[in-house]
UniProtKB/Swiss-Prot annotation:
It comes from Bacillus cereus (strain AH187). Its main location: cytoplasm. This is Probable transcriptional regulatory protein BCAH187_A0615. GO terms for biological process: regulation of DNA-templated transcription. One of its GO terms (cellular component) is cytosol. The keyword Transcription regulation applies. One of its GO terms (molecular function) is DNA binding. Keywords: Cytoplasm, DNA-binding, Transcription, Transcription regulation.
């Protein structure tokens, strides 16, 4: 799979820790999920996914409760979910998922982040076909064989189970996210190191050092945008 999920999450968490911007992004995502469906995660699968992700980033309960209460209160603030696709230095492929209340602003900001850092926006579908929507669940304290046995006994199908450093990472279809977590929770797993619905590149590429530095700068510029929720790409950053 080419991705060290714990390293990626740790890098993002350490980068975001000083600014708390990750909390703001989660607050927005939780609000949108709660507003679009029921504010109860038991009956709202989209909200449950966001809350499970938030746990792995240690998002404070106050942030979560505030976002849910805002949705319950009938706030008129509306957000559109928009996806942008584009290319970075050396043709690297990038997908940007956003939640925005101003489409024109977001489109201009995303375009500028690409163009100022050696990239360019593409049309819809220009790179998405090279990525697979994937549920990624990480845990510690069990071997891959033990996890496989748990999932087989629960009759849950997954794509792959890999040991990455001290963790076991399960890759599955997006609609199996809850089934995987439920089976593992029933088997005594109380905490997950990774809980993501992501776009996973079918093939990773490596870039020359100068191009990689420029690419990382571009990704940072995209992630710094208030409306950007997720940035997916096909570059092996070597972490």
């Amino acid at each position: 799979m080419g991705r060290k999920w714990n390293n990626i999450k740790d890098k993002k968490a350490s980068k975001d820790a000083n600014t708390s911007r990750i909390y703001a992004k989660f607050g927005r995502e939780i609000y949108v999920a709660a507003k679009q469906g029921e504010p109860d995660p038991e009956s709202n699968q989209a909200l449950r996914v966001v809350l499970e992700r938030a746990k792995t980033y240690n998002v404070p309960r106050t942030i979560i409760d505030r976002a849910v209460e805002k949705a319950k209160g009938g706030s008129e603030e509306n957000y559109d979910e928009l996806r942008y696709e584009g290319f970075g230095p050396n043709g690297a492929m990038v997908i940007v998922d956003t939640l925005t209340n101003n489409v024109n602003r977001t489109a201009a900001d995303v375009r500028a982040a690409f163009s100022k850092n050696g990239g360019n926006m593409g049309v819809n579908g220009s790179v998405a076909y090279m990525f697979d929507a994937t549920a990624v669940i990480g845990l510690e304290g069990k071997t891959s064989d033990e996890v496989l046995e748990i999932l087989m006994e629960a009759d849950v199908d997954v794509r792959d189970i890999l040991e990455e450093e001290d963790a076991v990472i399960v890759y599955a279809e997006p609609d199996q996210f809850h089934a995987v977590q439920s089976a593992l929770k029933d088997a005594g797993v109380e905490e997950f190191t990774v809980a993501e619905l992501t776009m996973l590149a079918q093939n990773d590429v490596t870039l020359p050092e100068d191009a990689q530095a420029q690419f990382e700068k571009m990704v940072d510029a995209l992630e710094d945008l208030e409306d950007v929720q997720q940035v997916y790409h096909n570059v092996d950053l070597g972490e």
